Amino acid sequence: GYSHRAATRRRAKALGIASRVVGDLAAAVRTTDLIILATPIFTFEQYFQELAGMVPPGCIVTDVGSTKLLPHQWADQKLGNAARYVGSHPIAGSEQRGVEFARDDLFDQARCILTTTEGTDRSATKTLKEFWAALGCIVRVMNPIEHDRVFANISHLPHVMAAGLVNASDEEDMKFAGKGFLDSTRISSGPASIWTDVVLANRENIADGIARAIAELSKLQGAIRDGKRERITELLETARR
């Protein structure tokens, strides 16, 4: 493995997560068949540029970021033909990060989305399907545009909505919060720096989702303000389905 942080390298080896971890990127990738980037999304462009001059012929490069259109564009521009890029998005993990939270069952029955374009190498896609399946994942392939639209709705929008709910709540009131509130807002405790990258990398889809959410909340707000019982029930029942 590779990490530019010495503390991370020491921790990974101490926990037995990696047998070899180095701080020199060129040394880490010189003879590798597969590279997986697990860094903030906006670091990918620079890594692709560096890797283009380091990787052996035929090497596959992937990532585990939750947005995919920009990484595909950067890979085309920076990696070119130096390596074969396929996007990966394993739907696993939690709001926690760091090698100390590694688990051997992390990918058991988890969905993993591979993203491809017309120019994606088919054999690289096949290899990655087999790789993620071997870890226990259920693999599906999408194009990056569809991926980013879907995950704006089911992953990124819920995160910003949770953040909005927390920010709209009084800190003193939250001392009395029960399981319902905590379940609704848990994801907002993910690292802000990571999520800022996600939001900016998929900003158009997320902004559209926020607009739809505001429209739905406005309907409910109006019904509540006007005391329209049937309309409130209708809106809540629609969500319950």
Name what the model sees in each region.
Residues 1-17:
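NAD(P)-binding Rossmann-fold cofactor-contacting core
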Residues 4-5, 39-40, 64-66:
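Short beta->alpha hinge that forms the Motif I/post-I loop of the SAM-binding pocket
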Residues 18, 32, 58, 109-110, ...:
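Short, well-ordered alpha-helix to beta-strand connector turns
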Residues 19-24, 140-141:
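Short acidic-hydrophobic, aromatic-tinged amphipathic segments that line or gate anion-handling sites
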Residues 25-60:
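Rossmann-like NAD(P)-binding element
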Residues 47-100:
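Rossmann-like NAD(P)(H) cofactor-binding subdomain of soluble oxidoreductases
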Residues 104-189:
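Internal alpha-helical scaffold of NAD(P)-dependent oxidoreductase catalytic cores
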Residues 172-240:
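Interdomain hinge/lid region at the active-site interface
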